[in-house]
Design a protein with these regions (language model features):
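Acidic/glycine-enriched connector segments
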Residues: 1-121
Length: 121
């Protein structure tokens, strides 16, 4: 899970609600940061209380900050079987990540698309 926008916060909250309702014995909520952000460094204890695991991408943290998020996003796609997103237009970093996921043969559910959400945008 990233932490770059409203959708990331909403998705994290949904995962925690489901874990609370059905139990957390078979799930975790992992935050993957592109580099140690100031927000994380200044609030490390609250982050550790909220997330099951916190990782910092080595490859992303070694890159220029503008490239770091895309590197981190691709790493998350590579580790995933299912990608859930909310992408309304075919431009920007989120779109590039979804495009990459589709190229990798991942199942993509786009919550912004009400009619056809699996592997379609």
């Amino acid at each position: 899970m990233g932490r770059s926008g409203d959708f990331d916060q909403y998705a994290s909250s949904a995962v925690l609600r489901v874990r609370k309702a059905v139990g957390d014995h078979n799930s975790s909520l992992t935050l993957v940061l592109p580099y140690p952000t100031a927000e994380y460094l200044n609030n490390q204890e609250s982050f550790e209380d909220y997330y099951s695991y916190i990782e910092v991408s080595d490859a992303a943290s070694a890159a220029h900050h503008k490239a770091a998020y895309q590197i981190r996003n691709r790493e998350m796609v590579d580790r995933s079987d299912l990608v859930v997103c909310y992408v309304e237009r075919e431009s920007g970093g989120a779109w590039q990540t979804v495009k990459y996921a589709l190229e990798q043969g991942k199942t993509v559910i786009n919550l912004a698309n009400e009619d056809e959400s699996v592997n379609l945008l």
